[in-house]
């Protein structure tokens, strides 16, 4: 891994860095077929697809009853860690809850907003034999905090669903758990089957099949966003500890061979030290092949900027899922960067802390969509409704404005609906 100069980036290199996509086009037609099967065949399709894709003959699709047993079965230290993480995530998301409000804006005119949760949510949690309890916690807890009536989890089927995943669903407060994976899980949530209830909102990370399915069903249900492989961008200055930066890059790279990991600094010696630290630690990692592939990704690299202003511009254009700022003036730099899914300030805020237990959510926008949206939060599950109360005095004050604008738009009935309330004058 060699460092590069930002100023020398060729146009095609810039495209690879700044115009990333989720890579779903290649599977769209296959995903559409899967969704059609789920919509038309229901549980029959879910069982057939489990056999086809997961090599599992599924009996009960609903494994809700296994949650409590799993919580008792996992090692105490694991369940304690799940509960500790859940408590932190819950506290942070409870702090996000908005209050209903109503205020007087003029005599006789009150305006306000109220917030109500959607009723049913589906959370996709990757992994069948593998365990991703953190994804369960991150998806379920904000929905529960928002007041959603029914929160269901779907996770890929296995001969035995990993008890850690089920234990996390129990700790998070999930109401249902289904052993359904991939695009078919998204279809089941969107269209319903004999076993799986339809939901109003589908959230959670997944592979390109899951992402393509979410794109297809958007409109039938609400979704969080279309997420791609994991991303990290580190902004570092000469005070950054290269070993810390390298450790963070390697940690994110182990997610996926398509993950994108980037460091940008205004100090060439720091860039060289980071690349050396990455190389020194790479071969010792259990997932070295995956990490190596991610480091070779066209959207990955270590870059030297001519100034910290250029580094900031690079970070803003990249709009990373995870942004780490390891620099002496990290708060000042943060004020200059608007586009990032989640920000980690200082050398002792590794992304792994946010991934698991700091309390913030790790379901975040990727592929530059942090320019236009934020990560999963309580707001994802809330609907806001505006409220207005006018008395006669309040409407009288607005009467001329409303009727004039209604007449200008040729909507005579709108004007008449106001005038009708003053016919006794």
Curated annotation (Swiss-Prot):
CDD domains reported for this sequence: Histidinol_dh
Binding, substrate: 230, 252, 255, 322, 355, 409, 414
Binding site for Zn(2+): 252, 255, 355, 414
Active site: 321-322
Pfam families (alphabetical): Histidinol_dh
Listed GO MF terms: histidinol dehydrogenase activity; NAD binding; zinc ion binding
GO cellular component, one term: cytoplasm
Oxidoreductase is among the record's keywords: yes
Membrane is among the record's keywords: no
Stored PROSITE patterns: HISOL_DEHYDROGENASE (PS00611)
One GO term of the biological process aspect: L-histidine biosynthetic process
Cofactor: Zn(2+)
InterPro entries tied to this protein: Ald_DH/histidinol_DH, Histidinol_DH_CS, Histidinol_DH_monofunct, Hstdl_DH
Pathway assigned to this chain's UniProt record: Amino-acid biosynthesis; L-histidine biosynthesis; L-histidine from 5-phospho-alpha-D-ribose 1-diphosphate: step 9/9
Catalytic activity: L-histidinol + 2 NAD(+) + H2O = L-histidine + 2 NADH + 3 H(+)
Known role: Catalyzes the sequential NAD-dependent oxidations of L-histidinol to L-histidinaldehyde and then to L-histidine.
Family: Belongs to the histidinol dehydrogenase family.
The protein's name in its UniProt record: Histidinol dehydrogenase
Lineage: Archaea, Methanobacteriati, Methanobacteriota, Stenosarchaea group, Halobacteria
Gene that this sequence comes from: hisD
């Amino acid at each position: 891994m060699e460092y590069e100069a930002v100023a020398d980036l060729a146009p095609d290199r810039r495209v690879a860095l700044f115009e990333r996509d989720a890579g779903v086009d290649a599977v769209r037609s296959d995903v559409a077929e899967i969704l059609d099967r789920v919509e038309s065949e229901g549980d029959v399709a879910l069982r057939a697809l489990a056999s086809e894709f997961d090599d599992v003959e599924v009996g009960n699709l609903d494994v809700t009853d296994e949650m409590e047993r799993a919580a008792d079965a996992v090692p105490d230290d694991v369940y304690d860690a799940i509960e500790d993480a859940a408590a932190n995530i819950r506290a942070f998301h409870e702090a996000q809850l908005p209050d209903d409000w109503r205020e007087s804006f003029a005599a006789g005119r009150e305006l306000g907003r109220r917030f109500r949760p959607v009723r049913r949510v589906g959370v996709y949690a990757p992994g069948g034999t593998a365990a991703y309890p953190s994804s369960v916690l991150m998806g379920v807890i904000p929905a529960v905090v928002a007041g959603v009536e029914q929160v269901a989890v779907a996770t890929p089927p296995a001969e035995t669903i990993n008890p850690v995943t089920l234990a996390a669903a129990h700790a998070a407060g999930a109401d249902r758990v289904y052993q359904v994976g991939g695009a078919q899980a998204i279809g089941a949530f969107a269209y319903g089957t004999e076993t799986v209830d339809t939901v109003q909102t589908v959230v959670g990370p997944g592979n390109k099949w899951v992402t393509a399915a979410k794109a297809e069903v958007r409109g039938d249900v609400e979704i969080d966003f279309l997420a791609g492989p994991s991303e990290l961008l580190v902004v570092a200055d000469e005070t950054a500890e290269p070993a810390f930066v390298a450790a963070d890059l390697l940690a994110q790279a182990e997610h996926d061979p398509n993950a994108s990991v980037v460091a940008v600094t205004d100090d060439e010696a720091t860039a060289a030290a980071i690349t050396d630290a990455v190389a020194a630690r790479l071969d010792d990692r259990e997932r070295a092949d995956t990490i190596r592939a991610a480091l070779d990704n066209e959207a990955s690299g270590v870059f030297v900027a001519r100034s910290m202003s250029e580094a900031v511009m690079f970070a803003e254009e990249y709009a990373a899922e995870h942004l780490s700022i390891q620099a002496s003036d990290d708060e000042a730099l943060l004020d200059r960067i608007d586009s990032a899914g989640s920000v980690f300030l200082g050398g002792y805020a590794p992304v792994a802390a946010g991934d698991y237990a700091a309390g913030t959510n790790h379901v975040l926008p990727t592929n530059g969509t942090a320019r236009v949206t934020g990560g999963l939060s309580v707001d994802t599950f809330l609907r806001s409704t505006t409220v207005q109360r006018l008395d006669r005095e309040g409407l009288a004050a607005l009467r001329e404005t409303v009727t004039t604008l209604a007449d200008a738009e040729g909507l005579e009935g709108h004007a008449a609906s106001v005038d009708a309330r003053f016919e006794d004058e």
